[in-house]
């Protein structure tokens, strides 16, 4: 019999083992779709971003008008820009749901996969931040000023670090140029990290909703999960195009319709919605360095999750107390997101502080205690 090229060719063999003949658990639910959805998001963002970069000028005097020109005069430029801007929001929706799934089903016990995933999240956040600065509107400029300024809280080297990042004594042309270069580079870094993430995942195989070994009951990835993924793509791309076509500015800030002006500060400086939870944690601490540390901790705490797992069962499927705690955490994050979008005044200050304390308490204290308690209840 002639050899099957799909299984013998060095390159096709890798693709075959990752996407076609990959043994997958038969019972993985729709929550396992978000990995492939993130892949589609990344591909869409790179393609639309490349097309936008062809018409963009990374210069403070021209950036704003070059974006306006893209929307007015380039064939379908408005659509490409709207898909790119809202695609970022969908990217974050997918990654947050993906992390939530991993947390709920104990996928973090694959430590290497989880850690590369957290690094991917950090890289994505950096990419989104530098990208937000590029249209050079008011919120772009002031967002860049405020967030980069946080590095000045680092003792001894802080101020030097900020001036080095800015390329001067304020956010100006050198800053915009380097941010554009970084925004172009980072997505390819994300693509590289994704292959590492998948390599680690395929070492151990996928987890499943029961959290038990599924070696005795595996099915090929194709056609079952390829079809399921295509359904997922449709269900994500439909709301994305709907948003981009019907209300493209829904998630944006009206301040960004005004060109950047270093002499006028917007009344409320706030980042895009997907950073608001971390921004609320940053604002809830009255000390600058303390706020920066809390901001960093709010995301870096994910690295600790595998070490805080005390339960004998992997997933939360059969652990109702942990489930309750999990949904309290989700609600808490939604409260933080809402508080981050509000002005710094009573009652938002105290709500933000309480929600920040609750966030860290749930993750660092309540989850390990609950898991130990559940072990006792189940006579483990």
From Swiss-Prot:
The cofactor remark states:
Binds 2 heme b groups non-covalently.
Membrane topology (UniProt): Multi-pass membrane protein
Q: Where are the transmembrane segments?
A: 34-54, 78-99, 114-134, 179-199, 227-247, 289-309, 321-341, 348-368
A GO term for molecular function: ubiquinol-cytochrome-c reductase activity
Q: Where does a ubiquinone bind?
A: 202
**Which BP terms in the Gene Ontology apply to this protein?**
mitochondrial electron transport, ubiquinol to cytochrome c
Q: Where in the cell is it found?
A: Mitochondrion inner membrane
| Binding partners and assembly | The cytochrome bc1 complex contains 11 subunits: 3 respiratory subunits (MT-CYB, CYC1 and UQCRFS1), 2 core proteins (UQCRC1 and UQCRC2) and 6 low-molecular weight proteins (UQCRH/QCR6, UQCRB/QCR7, UQCRQ/QCR8, UQCR10/QCR9, UQCR11/QCR10 and a cleavage product of UQCRFS1). This cytochrome bc1 complex then forms a dimer.
The miscellaneous annotation reads: Heme 1 (or BL or b562) is low-potential and absorbs at about 562 nm, and heme 2 (or BH or b566) is high-potential and absorbs at about 566 nm.
- Protein name stated in the entry: Cytochrome b
Organism expressing this protein natively: Pelecanoides georgicus
Q: What is the lineage of its organism?
A: Eukaryota, Metazoa, Chordata, Craniata, Vertebrata
């Amino acid at each position: 019999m002639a050899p099957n090229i799909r299984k013998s060719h060095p390159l096709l063999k890798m693709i075959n083992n990752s996407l076609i003949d990959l043994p997958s658990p038969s019972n993985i639910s729709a929550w396992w779709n978000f990995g492939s959805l993130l892949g589609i998001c990344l591909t869409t963002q790179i393609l639309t971003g490349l097309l936008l970069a062809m018409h963009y000028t990374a210069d403070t005097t021209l950036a704003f008008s070059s974006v306006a020109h893209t929307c007015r005069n380039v064939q379908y430029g408005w659509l490409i820009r709207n898909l790119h801007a809202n695609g970022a929001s969908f990217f974050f929706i997918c990654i947050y749901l993906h992390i939530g799934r991993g947390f709920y089903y104990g996928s973090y016990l694959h430590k290497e996969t989880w850690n590369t995933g957290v690094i991917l999240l950090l890289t994505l956040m950096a990419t989104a931040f530098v990208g937000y600065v590029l249209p050079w509107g008011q919120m772009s400029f002031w967002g860049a000023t405020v967030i980069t300024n946080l590095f000045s809280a680092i003792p001894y080297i802080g101020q030097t670090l900020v001036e080095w990042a800015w390329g001067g004594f304020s956010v100006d042309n050198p800053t915009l140029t380097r941010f554009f270069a970084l925004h172009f580079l980072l997505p390819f870094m994300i693509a590289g990290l994704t292959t590492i993430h998948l390599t680690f995942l395929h070492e151990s195989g996928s987890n499943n909703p029961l959290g038990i070994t599924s070696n005795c009951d595996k099915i090929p990835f194709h056609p079952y999960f390829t079809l399921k993924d295509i359904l997922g793509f449709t269900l994500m791309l439909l709301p994305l195009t709907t948003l981009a076509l019907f209300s493209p500015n829904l998630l944006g800030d009206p301040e960004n319709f005004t060109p950047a002006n270093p002499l006028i500060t917007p009344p409320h400086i706030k980042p895009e919605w997907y950073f608001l939870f971390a921004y609320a944690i940053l604002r809830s601490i009255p000390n600058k360095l303390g706020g920066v540390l809390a901001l960093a901790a709010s995301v870096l705490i994910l690295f600790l999750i595998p070490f805080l797992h005390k339960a004998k069962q992997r997933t939360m499927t059969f652990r109702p107390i942990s489930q309750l705690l999990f949904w309290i955490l989700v609600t808490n994050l939604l409260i933080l997101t809402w508080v981050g979008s509000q002005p710094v005044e009573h009652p938002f200050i105290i709500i933000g502080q309480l929600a920040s304390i609750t966030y860290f308490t749930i993750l660092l204290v309540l989850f390990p205690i609950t898991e130990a308690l559940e072990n006792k209840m189940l006579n483990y």
